[in-house]
Amino acid sequence: MNKQILTLALCIGLCLAVGFAGSTFTPKPASWYYTTLVKPSWNPPDWLFPPVWTILFIMMGTALAKVLGTGWKKNEVNVGVVLFAIQLMLNLGWSASFFGMQSPLAGLVDIVLLWIFIVLTMLAFARVSKPASLLLVPYLCWVSFASYLNFTILQLNP
């Protein structure tokens, strides 16, 4: 198997695995916690989240593979990979905070940190591969929206 294809498959697989791990914290729509939260009228329907996140995780994995494909010997690559790993763990942490701990406040703290680390990752990736950085733009947009949604849910559920 071609090394680039293997790297791509492993990177996408890693991101999807983190997404799957995060989904274990996400309750079914009928769970008492989720149904008791007051949500804004513009809250997306529940069915929208899985396909959006799947696409985003595939794009994230592709971005990581592009950066790794430039070689580990560059300091910029190592910095980008570390930042990517941090934001990936913060992504997982949001599900654990918001749903697992049932805390919109903890979720908001986590998602703000996640947003910061996505931006830092994009900046680091841009030094190595502009296309890799651009692949993270939809992710940043979605997390920006999710941050505002999280903030609004916190306000509606004091």
From Swiss-Prot:
GO cellular component: membrane; plasma membrane
Pfam families in the record: TspO_MBR
Membrane spanning residue stretches: 5-25, 48-68, 79-99, 105-125, 134-154
Outcome after substituting residue 146 to T: Decreases affinity for protoporphyrin IX. Nearly abolishes protoporphyrin IX photooxidation
Keywords: Cell membrane, Membrane, Transmembrane, Transmembrane helix, Transport
Biological process terms in GO annotation: tetrapyrrole metabolic process
GO MF assignments: tetrapyrrole binding
Cross-referenced CDD domains: TSPO_MBR
Signal sequence annotation: none
Membrane topology: Multi-pass membrane protein
Cell membrane is among the record's keywords: yes
Family indicated by similarity: Belongs to the TspO/BZRP family.
Function: Binds tetrapyrroles and promotes the photooxidative degradation of protoporphyrin IX. Can bind the benzodiazepine receptor agonist PK-11195 (in vitro); this interferes with photooxidative tetrapyrrole degradation. May play a role in the transmembrane transport of tetrapyrroles and similar compounds.
Annotated protein name in UniProt: Tryptophan-rich protein TspO
The species this protein was found in: Chlorobaculum tepidum (strain ATCC 49652 / DSM 12025 / NBRC 103806 / TLS) (Chlorobium tepidum)
